[in-house]
Amino acid sequence: MEGQGCCGGGGGKTEMIPTEEALRIVFGVSKRLPPVIVSLYEALGKVLAEDIRAPDPLPPYPASVKDGYAVVASDGPGEYPVITESRAGNDGLGVTVTPGTVAYVTTGGPIPDGADAVVQVEDTKVIGDVSTESKRVKILIQTKKGTDIRRVGCDIEKDATVLTTGERIGASEIGLLATAGVTMVKVYPMPIVAILSTGDELVEPTAGTLGRGQIRDSNRAMLVAAVMQQQCKVVDLGIVRDDRKELEKVLDEAVSSGVDIILTSGGVSMGDRDFVKPLLEEKGKVYFSKVLMKPGKPLTFAEIRAKPTESMLGKTVLAFGLPGNPVSCLVCFNIFVVPTIRQLAGWTSPHPLRVRLRLQEPIKSDPIRPEFHRAIIKWKDNDGSGTPGFVAESTGHQMSSRLLSMRSANALLELPATGNVLSAGSSVSAIIVSDISAFSIDKKASLSEPGSIRKEKKYDEVPGPEYKVAILTVSDTVSAGAGPDRSGPRAVSVVDSSSEKLGGAKVVATAVVPDEVERIKDILQKWSDVDEMDLILTLGGTGFTPRDVTPEATKKVIERETPGLLFVMMQESLKITPFAMLSRSAAGIRGSTLIINMPGNPNAVAECMEALLPALKHALKQIKGDKREKHPKHIPHAEATLPTDTWDQSYKSAYETGEKKEEAGCSCTH
């Protein structure tokens, strides 16, 4: 029997399959649950199963942007009588503002008929006693038609799609549903998960004194909590003894009760009383029972077909026989069960979030099995390379029965099976399994202590790069570990070697994601909005194959397109190969971040960067707000004297000959 907290059994002829293959099998079997209708507040955290359209425009009436006075714009400045007040609801209903009259309006209030502009209160002056019934106001400025009025439907047009199938519902989505008047929502339900532990040695956590050979059941409590964190309904099946008939009865009852997933803990190794796998083979189909991973090798995945009843058609129940060792159990839950829950719940991208980080200390890898090493990761101003980034600290001794190694762990480091020591500062991939600690609190002091002497310059005192660059490799092959990333390192090399030409640019983040729109979109948004990168280069996924979706993901993120950059890259690439015309790259700006899709070919990356270099530095400056023109014959703005003939005169002046040139003014804003 493989008990909790005990070393599991080994042996057997079943071959271990790689983690990636095991996940592929699980995803192939796991099918999205049929949608259900729930109330508005029950929809929180679930995935939308229908498009939501706005039944009404928003705003449904012309509304004031500010507190002020609704006027006829052509009236201009002057004194006017205030004929009504429009605050909310039916205020001002039936009253028409005619030339020579005004109406008081509050922010969000409806604009009375006849008015075509609003003058804010700051640009008006009340005449006489404001308490009198006949009020007059002086309009101090000339306004234009439409000023400070939100037209009908300016936020949301009638029948516009406000939410689409596949979106996960958060607080803002609840607000949009309420805006659209939706009180019942079609969503994909969270799966119902049944949990049981097996083993004669197990007792409830409430047991006061342990008998000889007994241990408290930690796995079941841990799994119940983990499943509840995923917002699933839990069915607690308790502890089942090492008795085949008792275990079979509990499994049959669970399957017939309508659960979607069964999690067992223990009983999946090679002991003579490990009955979980034989029963799963008897009642369904076992897809695998050993995975090439550490910890978690004795993991069983099966599919059970429930018998149809009068109240329920036969359904498929997924079963995971998790290892009995606590750490192995929780690691397998995070690697396999969490993505399965998300898949059943309708997530478009159920895969766990991965990040690149640097090791804070040396770690020896296993020579045979890829390891999911428990670690605590945090963001630091200096990750050891002189730039900000995530760093990882091991939780200590990684024995699979030692639950303390999971304490405070928020990530699983993905260590390759080389048997080598990964030195401190090595870059590795990590799977996020819980909240990441915020930015480090140990900030650099801005002032030195009196009398202190700076003897040497340390890494964390080096000023940051002028422009932060992130490189995203988009590839199913590289993401799955089935091939090396050749484009990413080449792009890093090209950027770093061109740092001076780019105004001090430096690559501070890299990542690899599969060809999936949501995964690409999520990291582009994070790098733009959270990490505030100046330049993001994506590599690959720009061709014609069905999995080439990088442009689609990028277009969902960018706010302003930059077609000129794509034109230049296309021209350069066509000099090399006619197949360059098959590129569907996108480029654009999000906030203060420039995002450019590049080909996945390493040589093409270098060619495209070379083509963009003459203008890229200036582009990055402009995005940051620098409006100075860089035409080689253009007189600098600081030297311009005349305020007119902005470009033409300035340009001609630059070409004039003779001892004295006519000074040309410039007011360029491009």
Curated annotation (Swiss-Prot):
Changing residue 583 to A: No effect on activity. Changing residue 597 to L: Loss of molybdopterin binding. Loss of activity. One of its GO terms (molecular function) is ATP binding. It comes from the Eukaryota. Keywords: ATP-binding, Magnesium, Metal-binding, Molybdenum, Molybdenum cofactor biosynthesis, Multifunctional enzyme, Nucleotide-binding, Transferase. Its EC number is 2.10.1.1, 2.7.7.75. The G domain: homotrimer or homohexamer. The E domain: homodimer. In the N-terminal section; belongs to the MoaB/Mog family. This is Molybdopterin biosynthesis protein CNX1. It comes from Arabidopsis thaliana.
